[in-house]
């Protein structure tokens, strides 16, 4: 997936006093040293709500998200866009659904890098992938799991809890622990 930050790096290279004649983007090429580091990019246009869903191949996440884009677009009058990423295994491999919604046409030809909403439909992914770092500040994270609130508090990795914890108010001391909803 080539994203805008990588394209910005190409233009910055071309505008530099000594541009690299041959280069790579999207990878860190530690053998040739020809990689251009990706430049910061603020993300989607304003008014675009971006979502990322992590699923397991065959669990229905991708199919449900294909339907979601159609339903939201048809019933709300909003524009929708969806890209789907599949593991080579297909069944039982990792799937990622990248959805965007906006009041104007959504024209982002790359995967969601920072999302307003992230859902993880396979609880084992929390320990395997850095999912919550892709959440925008103030975003919503939904973990589909079978644990109670107390079990979840004990089970979640500390790094995940720190990322999801609300930022402390100025001068209020250490951050508060994350809020875990009570079991239903």
For each feature predicted by the language model, list its residue ranges:
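Active-site cofactor/cluster-binding pocket
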Residues: 1, 45-57, 61-184
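Peripheral docking tails and interdomain loops at the edges
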Residues: 1-44, 170-171, 179, 184
